[in-house]
Structure formats: structure tokens, C-alpha cells
């Protein structure tokens, strides 16, 4: 009986959050590093489906780096990186598009639909969603090939899907006005899309428990940071590596009108629900100011 009472209390605890977030849009970035466990993947898709059923409009953007590297290895093609970005020649770009759009995206859509949601998979090329440019380094001698930056987000196709009651699932592949295809950092896409959609929240599901005050100690997670604190920590080297594009996307989002941003460990079952609908939270929230 006590277990049942605790479950009921959990539902009661979620009520004010459900009321506050009803009709709001959450942009959720699901990192490729958290996709390896099929059981956990199912849990995350359950969370997203439940969000839809309680009145939230979830928009899912996914990565897929490990799946791309695995596909390249199966074709005896070496994966090469510069500053964490994949060198993407024309052949690799075709492979990236095939894996992200044709495999990873459709698998996530299929899971959500099987769970009772109505998901539609698209990429940045559909409806002109992501207008991209070639990513240019300050060091002009570095050429990453078909790696792009976001020039413009045209959110109409996503807004129409939300209006129709669907859950958009988006691959971070965009195209230029000239028709060139580009692979774009999914963290960056998520941040810019959240701003364009005037989202209530931007949420990153990654493989660590948020931001740590000591990069070498996972027990030093901080529950919240302001934009100024994040900038300071980047300068001090407390935030580095793959966490940098995530927090930079969070900074842009909250500076441009997104209410809250969160970085969560997607390897924790039901991480989304625990962060959004409980009083405690489990990740790091980044906000404009306290």
C-alpha cells in the first residue's frame, strides 16, 4: 500500500508542473552518445510520448555520431576529426545523411509511434527548415568539407506539425541556397530552433550528469548556473570539450527568450520526467539570471 501511496504522491507533485507547461514547446536534443542502450532509448521515447499526452509539445532533435562512425567502419572508411568535428567529404556526407535521416531518425519515429505517439521524421532540408552555410574556421587552412553552420531557421514546417498534433523528430542535416548538403552540430541546431519556436525549454540529453564544478569529479554537479557563470567557467576551463557547444546553445537560447535550459544525463531512466516534473531535478539548469 505504501508503494501505491508514493506513486500517487509523485503524480500530485507533478500537477503544478503539468499545469504550468500545458501547451508549451520543449526542444529536446537527444545525443548519439546516449543511444547505445535500446532499453534506455525506449525509456526516453516513453518520456517524450508522455509529455505529449500531458499537453506539452515536444520537438526532438537527435545526433548519431557513434552510428555514423560504425557505418564508416563497416565500409572501411576512416573517421577523422578536427577539434571534435568530423571531416566530411562528399562520400562521407552521403553516408551521414543515410544514417541520420534514413536509420536513426526513422528508428526513433517508429518507437514513439509504437508507444502511442504520433511522430513525423524530417531533416533540416525538408520545408527549408535549416538554411546552412559551409562552416569556415578562422584558420583558413582547415577544411572540414560538408560541415555546416546554421544561417537561418525557417520553423513553419515544425509549427505545422505541432499544430497537427504530431511530434517532430529532426535530423541535423541542412542545405544551402545553392543546394549543397551539410552535416550540422545537433547542439547548435537545437539551440537555434528553440529560439525560433519561442520554446519554453531547451533540454540536452547527454552522457554526464550535467555540468560539474570540477571537471574531473562527477560528484560536483551543480544544479543551476547563470549565463555569466557559464561564461566564466568556460574561460577558467571548468567547462570544456563537448560540453562547450551545449552550454553555448543554452546561453544563446536563454538570452533570446527561451525560459529555461537543462543539461541531463540521458543514461538515467526517465531523466526527462525526473527533471521536469519533480521538485528535486537531476541535471543542471542554465538560466539568464537568478
From Swiss-Prot:
Coiled-coil parts of chain: none
Domain of life per record: Bacteria
GO molecular function: acetylglutamate kinase activity; ATP binding
Protein's GO biological process: arginine biosynthetic process via ornithine; L-arginine biosynthetic process
EC id: 2.7.2.8
UniProt-listed Pfam families: AA_kinase
Function field: Catalyzes the ATP-dependent phosphorylation of N-acetyl-L-glutamate.
Record protein name field: Acetylglutamate kinase
UniProt source species: Halothermothrix orenii (strain H 168 / OCM 544 / DSM 9562)
Gene: argB
Amino acid at each position: 500500500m505504501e508503494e501505491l501511496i508514493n506513486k500517487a504522491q509523485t503524480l500530485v507533485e507533478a500537477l503544478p508542473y503539468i499545469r504550468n507547461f500545458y501547451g508549451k514547446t520543449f526542444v529536446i536534443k537527444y545525443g548519439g552518445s546516449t543511444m547505445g542502450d535500446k532499453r534506455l532509448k525506449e525509456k526516453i521515447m516513453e518520456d517524450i510520448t508522455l509529455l505529449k499526452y500531458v499537453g506539452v509539445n515536444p520537438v526532438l532533435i537527435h545526433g548519431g555520431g557513434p552510428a555514423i562512425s560504425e557505418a564508416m567502419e563497416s565500409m572501411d572508411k576512416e573517421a577523422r576529426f578536427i577539434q571534435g568535428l568530423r571531416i566530411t567529404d562528399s562520400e562521407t556526407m552521403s553516408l551521414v545523411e543515410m544514417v541520420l535521416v534514413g536509420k536513426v531518425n526513422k528508428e526513433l519515429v517508429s518507437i514513439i509511434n509504437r508507444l502511442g505517439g504520433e511522430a513525423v521524421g524530417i531533416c533540416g532540408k525538408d520545408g527549408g527548415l535549416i538554411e546552412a552555410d559551409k562552416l569556415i574556421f578562422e584558420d583558413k587552412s582547415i577544411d572540414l568539407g560538408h560541415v555546416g553552420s546554421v544561417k537561418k531557421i525557417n520553423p513553419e514546417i515544425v509549427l505545422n506539425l505541432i499544430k497537427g498534433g504530431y511530434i517532430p523528430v529532426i535530423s541535423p542535416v541542412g542545405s544551402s541556397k545553392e543546394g549543397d548538403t551539410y552535416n550540422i552540430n545537433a547542439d547548435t541546431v537545437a539551440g537555434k530552433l528553440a529560439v525560433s519556436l519561442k520554446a519554453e525549454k531547451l533540454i540536452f540529453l547527454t552522457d554526464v550528469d550535467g555540468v560539474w564544478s570540477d571537471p574531473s569529479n562527477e560528484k560536483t554537479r551543480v544544479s543551476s548556473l547563470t549565463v555569466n557563470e557559464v561564461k566564466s567557467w568556460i574561460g577558467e576551463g571548468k567547462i570544456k570539450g563537448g560540453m562547450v557547444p551545449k552550454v553555448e546553445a543554452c546561453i544563446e537560447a536563454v538570452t533570446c527568450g527561451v525560459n529555461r535550459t537543462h543539461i541531463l544525463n540521458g543514461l538515467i531512466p526517465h531523466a526527462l520526467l525526473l527533471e521536469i516534473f519533480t521538485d528535486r531535478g537531476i541535471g543542471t539548469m542554465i538560466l539568464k539570471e537568478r
